[in-house]
Amino acid sequence: MKILSCLLLCTITVLEGNVMNRHNKRFAGFNVAGIGGTAGCVVVDNKLFANGFFLRELTAEEQREFAQYVEESNKYKEELKVSLEERRKGWQIARQSEKGAKILSTITEKNLPKPPKKPSFCTAADTTQYYFDGCMVQNNKIFVGQSYVRDLTADEAKELKSFDVKMTAYQKYLSSSIQQQMNSLFGDKTNLLNLFTNTHLESTSQASEATTIPTTTQTPVEAPETPSFCVPIY
């Protein structure tokens, strides 16, 4: 069990190494069901913040939109809590039942509730952060730590947009590569589930033995070159 876990962690670490070594990453978020923090958009006394940075005061229309979002968000959290509890109980029953495979299939087919739509005043342009060596860019503004430096020029904004497109393609390639490595190590999703829940179902085992994992080749996607909006001194 410990060996398999280590193999999985090593696989992910190696495949993600290129991104980490280049010292750049992209982050975007709008927290609905989490425990809080400054990630994504935050509203305090009708003041809008994005990832900890103050943006502006909400308009009267945006305040009404925000009130509706809060109501829908609270409803979503309650529905999610109920749904997760149902799944937890289902997993317990599946582990003790001879029909565990069928029960697990029923659980996974039932969709979790969908979170409410984000308010119009909280967009990807507001919350997406680009971390480079020495600085961060958000909403076309350069920050060093928490200090605002300046706005990007028109040419720099175009360069950042091009970087975003290339980084998105690279992240998709990386994610696909990780999934292929996981499949080659553990087989299909059901087998991986059994490894970590100690659920050993005969029908699943027989099906996995008869399954051959196809090998696919992907055209490698290189990590994009980092924009030089700031230059750190080592």
UniProtKB/Swiss-Prot annotation:
It holds the Pfam family Pepsin-I3. One of its GO terms (molecular function) is aspartic-type endopeptidase inhibitor activity. Residues 211-220 have a biased composition (Low complexity). GO terms for cellular component: extracellular region. Disulfide bonds join C135-C230. The keyword Signal applies. Keywords: Aspartic protease inhibitor, Disulfide bond, Protease inhibitor, Secreted, Signal. Residues 204-234 are annotated as: Disordered. Belongs to the protease inhibitor I33 family. Aspartyl protease inhibitor. This is Filarial antigen Av33. It comes from Acanthocheilonema viteae (Filarial nematode worm).
